[in-house]
C-alpha cells in the first residue's frame, strides 16, 4: 500500500513518485490550495494539493482533500518536490508531496481529543489507541522497545539463556498479595500469578542452567502509585557459581552499555558503592538521589541533655534518632511554607517538625531555641554547618521513622530549591539488613525476600544475632530510583529452613508452601545469585517521564482499572459456577 514512510521522505526523492499511507494530522483548505500534514510512525510530511484548471483529476483530488478531518486514514500518491518555505521543525521540512491521488481508507469519527492535545489521564487511558498516536507517546514507547531489544542482544551475545517460567503457579508468601486464579479441574484450589520468577530461576540453577534471563511479566495485588502497576515487566537474571561482585560487575557493565546504546548517555565508569546503613544515615533512604548534595546530620550526642523533651527522649533511646537537614538559602521560607514542609513530613510519619531559621543578618527564628543555652545552641548550629540565610529542619523519634520523613524532606527541598544537579547518578547499595521487625505482626519479615542469603554461614550465629544480621542483598539505584534489586541466594536447605523459622514460618508450613524448593536445594544446589531490573522504571527514566504509565502501552489507573476495556468487570454466574466460585454480596 506504500512505497515510503511519511517521516522519511527527503531531498533524495525529489522528482520521484511515492505512495504514502497514514493519518491526517492537520488539513488546511486555503481556497486555491490544500495542505495536508500526513503522519505515520516515522513522522510527518506535507502533502500539497493544487488543482489545475481544466484537469478533472486534480479537481477530484482537491475535492477529497477539502473533505478531510482529523485522523482520517489516507493513501496518497504524488511527486516529491522541494518546498519553497522550508520547515526546520520537522525532518521532512525541505520537501513536500504534490498529490496526484488521495484515497480515504477510513474516516475518523469526531475525536475526544486531538493528537497534539494533552487531555486528562482518564481520557487518555479510555482512548489509549488515540493517546498512543501522539508523537510524544510514540517516542516513549519506542524508547521502551529499544531498551528491551538492546537487553536481549546484550545477554544473548554473552551466553545467557532466555527461559520461560510458569504464569500459573503456586501461591507463596512473597510480600504483596497474590492474584489468584481458580483451578476449574481442582475445586476449591487456586493458582497464583507470579510476583516474580524467583523460585523457578533458582531451581533452574539447580537444574544446571548456568546463566538465565527472561523478560518476565509479574503480578502484585498492591496499592498503585506513579511508579507501581498491578502487572509489570522485569528483566530477570540468575547466575550459578557467583559471588556478589560477579553479578554486580556484569550488570553494571550491561546497564552502562544499554544507556549508551538506547539514549546515548555515558554513565559513570565505575558506580559508587554504599552500605544500607550509610545510605540511611546520610540520606534517609535506601535509594538516595545523589544528584542532591544535601545530607542529614545526626545531632543526638548534642541534644541528650536538652530541655526539649522530644529531642532528649529520642537521643537517649537506643533505637532513636535526632537528625538535622540544612537547606542553604532556606531562610526565605515563609511560615506557611514551613507548615507545608511539616505536612509533607507528616505523610511519612512525622509527629512534628522543629526548625531553626537564620536570616541573612543572623537573626534567629525558631520554636526550639528557648530550650538551649547560648553555648549549646551555637554548638548545634556549628555541627550542622548552618550559615546566615539557611534553615535547618530537625526530626526526632525512632531511627527508621526519622530517616523516612527526613529523607522525604531532603527530596522535596532539593526540588523546591533547584538543588537537583543535571545528569545521572548511579549507585550500588549493599549490605542490607537481613530482617526487619514487624510491630503489628510481632515477628521478623525479610527486607528483600526469604531466599536472600545472610552474610554469615553459621546458623547458630544467625539465630543469635537476627536483629542485626546483614544480608547479601544489593540494589542498583539511579537518580533516586531503585532500578534493580538482587542478592546471593540461600543454596543450603538447612540455612533456608533456619531463615523460614526466624520469619515465623514453621517446618510444616515451610513444607506445604516451599517443599519443592527445599527438595531442590537438597539435591546439590550450586551457590547462585541474581538480580531483577524494572523495565518499566528504566524505560521511564530513559524517556524522561515521572510515571511508568507513560511507557506501558496499556496501563491500569491508580484505581486499578483498565478504562479502555472496562476491566475488571462482573463475571456471569455460569462462569463462576464452572470454577466453583461464589461471590458474596458487598457488605452495606
From Swiss-Prot:
One GO cellular component, as annotated: cytoplasm
Primary site of residence: cytoplasm
Record-listed ATP binding positions: 220-222, 229, 482, 534-537
Localization: Cytoplasm
EC number: 6.1.1.12
Reactions this protein catalyses: tRNA(Asp) + L-aspartate + ATP = L-aspartyl-tRNA(Asp) + AMP + diphosphate
UniProt KW keywords: Aminoacyl-tRNA synthetase, ATP-binding, Cytoplasm, Ligase, Nucleotide-binding, Protein biosynthesis
Stretches the record annotates as Aspartate: 198-201
Entry function: Catalyzes the attachment of L-aspartate to tRNA(Asp) in a two-step reaction: L-aspartate is first activated by ATP to form Asp-AMP and then transferred to the acceptor end of tRNA(Asp).
Name under which the protein is recorded: Aspartate--tRNA ligase
Organism listed in the record: Xanthomonas campestris pv. campestris (strain B100)
Name of the gene encoding the protein in the UniProt record: aspS
Amino acid at each position: 500500500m506504500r512505497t515510503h514512510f511519511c517521516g522519511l521522505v527527503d531531498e533524495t526523492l525529489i522528482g520521484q513518485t511515492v505512495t504514502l499511507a497514514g493519518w491526517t494530522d492537520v488539513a488546511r483548505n486555503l481556497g486555491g490550495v490544500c495542505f495536508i500534514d500526513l503522519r505515520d510512525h516515522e513522522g510527518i510530511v506535507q502533502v500539497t494539493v493544487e488543482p489545475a484548471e481544466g484537469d478533472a483529476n486534480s479537481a477530484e483530488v482537491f475535492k477529497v482533500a477539502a473533505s478531510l478531518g482529523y485522523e482520517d486514514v489516507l493513501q496518497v500518491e504524488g511527486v516529491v518536490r522541494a518546498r519553497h518555505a522550508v520547515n526546520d521543525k520537522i525532518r521532512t521540512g525541505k520537501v513536500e508531496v504534490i498529490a496526484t491521488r488521495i484515497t480515504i481508507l477510513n474516516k475518523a469519527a469526531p475525536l475526544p481529543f486531538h493528537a497534539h492535545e494533552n487531555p486528562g489521564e482518564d481520557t487518555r487511558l479510555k482512548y489509549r489507541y488515540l493517546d498512543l498516536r501522539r508523537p510524544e507517546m510514540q517516542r516513549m514507547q519506542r524508547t521502551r522497545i529499544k531498551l528491551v531489544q538492546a537487553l536481549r542482544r546484550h545477554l544473548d551475545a554473552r551466553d545467557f539463556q532466555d527461559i520461560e517460567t510458569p504464569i500459573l503457579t503456586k501461591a507463596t508468601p512473597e510480600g504483596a498479595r497474590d492474584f489468584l486464579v481458580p483451578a476449574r479441574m481442582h475445586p476449591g484450589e487456586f493458582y497464583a500469578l507470579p510476583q516474580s520468577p524467583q523460585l523457578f530461576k533458582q531451581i533452574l540453577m539447580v537444574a544446571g542452567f548456568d546463566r538465565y534471563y527472561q523478560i518476565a511479566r509479574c503480578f502484585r495485588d498492591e496499592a498503585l502509585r506513579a511508579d507501581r502497576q498491578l502487572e509489570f515487566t522485569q528483566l530477570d537474571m540468575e547466575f550459578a557459581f557467583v559471588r556478589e561482585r560477579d553479578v554486580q560487575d556484569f550488570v553494571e557493565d550491561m546497564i552502562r552499555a544499554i544507556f549508551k546504546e538506547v539514549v546515548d548517555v555515558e554513565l559513570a565508569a565505575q558506580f559508587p558503592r554504599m552500605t544500607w546503613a550509610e545510605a540511611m544515615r546520610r540520606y534517609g533512604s535506601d535509594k538516595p538521589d545523589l544528584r542532591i548534595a544535601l545530607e542529614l546530620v545526626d545531632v543526638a550526642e548534642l541534644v541528650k541533655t536538652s530541655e526539649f523533651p522530644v529531642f532528649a527522649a529520642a537521643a537517649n533511646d537506643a533505637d532513636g534518632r535526632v537528625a538535622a537537614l540544612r537547606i542553604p538559602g532556606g531562610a526565605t521560607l515563609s511560615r506557611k511554607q514551613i507548615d507545608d514542609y511539616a505536612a509533607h513530613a507528616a505523610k511519612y510519619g512525622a509527629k512534628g517538625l522543629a526548625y531553626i531559621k537564620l536570616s541573612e543578618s543572623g537573626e534567629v527564628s525558631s520554636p526550639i531555641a528557648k530550650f538551649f543555652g547560648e553555648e549549646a545552641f551555637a554548638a548545634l548550629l556549628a555541627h550542622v554547618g548552618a550559615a546566615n540565610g539557611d534553615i535547618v529542619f530537625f526530626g526526632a523519634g525512632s531511627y527508621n521513622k526519622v530517616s523516612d520523613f527526613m529523607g522525604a524532606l531532603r527530596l522535596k527541598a532539593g526540588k523546591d530549591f533547584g538543588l537537583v544537579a543535571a545528569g545521572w547518578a548511579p549507585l550500588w547499595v549493599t549490605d542490607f539488613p537481613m530482617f526487619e521487625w514487624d510491630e503489628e505482626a510481632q515477628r521478623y519479615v525479610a527486607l528483600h525476600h526469604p531466599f536472600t542469603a545472610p552474610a554469615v554461614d553459621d546458623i547458630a550465629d544467625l539465630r543469635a544475632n537476627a536483629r542485626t544480621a546483614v544480608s547479601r542483598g544489593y540494589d542498583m539505584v539511579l537518580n533516586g530510583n531503585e532500578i534493580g534489586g538482587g542478592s546471593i541466594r540461600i543454596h543450603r536447605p538447612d540455612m533456608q529452613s533456619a531463615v523460614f523459622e526466624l520469619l515465623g514460618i514453621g517446618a510444616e508450613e515451610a513444607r506445604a508452601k516451599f517443599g519443592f524448593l527445599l527438595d531442590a536445594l537438597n539435591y546439590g544446589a550450586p551457590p547462585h545469585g541474581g538480580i531483577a531490573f524494572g523495565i518499566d522504571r528504566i524505560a521511564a527514566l530513559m524517556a524522561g517521564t515521572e510515571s511508568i504509565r507513560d511507557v506501558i502501552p496499556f496501563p491500569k489507573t491508580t484505581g486499578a482499572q483498565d478504562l479502555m476495556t472496562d476491566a475488571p468487570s462482573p463475571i456471569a454466574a455460569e462462569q463462576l459456577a464452572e470454577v466453583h466460585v461464589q461471590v458474596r454480596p458487598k457488605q452495606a
